[in-house]
Amino acid sequence: MDIQLIKGEFTPHDAIEIMTQIIHAKIKFQEGKINESSNEEDSKMRERRIKQLQKNLYDARHYIEHQKGKISLESQIHLV
């Protein structure tokens, strides 16, 4: 089963806003799991994931800010 979250062309501003909202939701989820966890190894893995998400967002923003015209975004959840 697939759930289509995003599919379309967006202005650079809107593309950045959409990506920022989604990535921040994922970061908030990971932070919540860190707060619930007593497992140090699990917390460290989640902290690494947060840093990776932050870097991905930074890189994507930088890329989008240097593009002209509309940006195509596509994202889906694939349930297996």
Question: What is the predicted role of each segment?
Answer:
Residues 1-80:
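Extended, charge-rich alpha-helical interface modules
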